[in-house]
Amino acid sequence: SSVTGVQTCALPILNIENPTKTAACLFVDKEEIGSMGNTGMESNVFSTFMSDVLNKLGVNRPNLLDKMFCNSRMLSADVDAGLDPIYASVADLHNASFLNKGVGISKYTGVAGKANGSDANAEFVAYIRGIFESNNVGYQIAELGRVDLGGGGTIAYILANKGVDVLDCGVPVLSMHAPYEVTSKYDVYQAYKGYEAFFRS
């Protein structure tokens, strides 16, 4: 349910009393229709909020917001397309995520080859893998589907375009966007552990 999704993302940051670095958890919607509107990631609400923080700290100056984004790291906690055995033809069996194998990490997202995609750099992928492995987080590397058959976008490209290191990292789901979706409790728990480990890093 959406409650489980919010808890999986919100509780890790709430568990940290004194983060070593500035930590934020942002909840946005409208991703399926282009992330538009004041609650979508294309909105300027987050940039305005961060500018206000810099102003209240008395440190804001020209281009500081841009530099802040370029020095930021993000996990885009969108769900991953789990391999559905009934519709296996739309997945790349060697690059699909499976239920009960951990949170899915997608280095690349997009459709039709590389259109509207985001591609995390190898160094950032290695950084996240290191955090997960040192905290015993079960994870799997996956793609969203076969080229030109599956695939899909997330909000990762929006922040990546601002200079943020972004990696898609979410729970594999069967029957995504259907009235009845299926996930694994193990994968949800590994996502929770992974997000908390990331906030603590």
Where are these regions (language model features)?
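Conserved active-site and cofactor/substrate-binding residues in soluble primary-metabolism enzymes
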Residues: 6, 41-49, 119-126, 150-153, ...
